[in-house]
Amino acid sequence: MKIFNTLSGKKDEFEPLENNKVRMYVCGMTVYDDTHIGHARTFVSFDIIVRYLRSAGYEVQYIRNITDVDDKILERSKELGMTPFELTDKYIQSMNQDFSTLKTVSYTHLRAHETLL
């Protein structure tokens, strides 16, 4: 499999850093509203890559973040009369349902507020 290298401007043969193991991090959603087609396109695209790598025999660790601390979240929660955590929990559940409907592969998610100092 070849991957486009933006630094060199060339397609390079994919070589994992660790034999037969691939770690993928994909920037996730900022959860202040429903999932839209742009989100779906991103996650379906990476879903295809994860499935391909697994079918090629790689062990894949797939991680996406969820941004649950953001000015847009604070504004939206005030508009709806909810706490920021109530708002983000609502949209995380909705997002997970949408991706379940799309039958995307499971992933590990990191919530931004859990990784802040």
Regions picked out by a protein language model, each given a short descriptive name:
Residues 108-117:
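Conserved small/polar residues in nucleotide/adenosyl-binding loops
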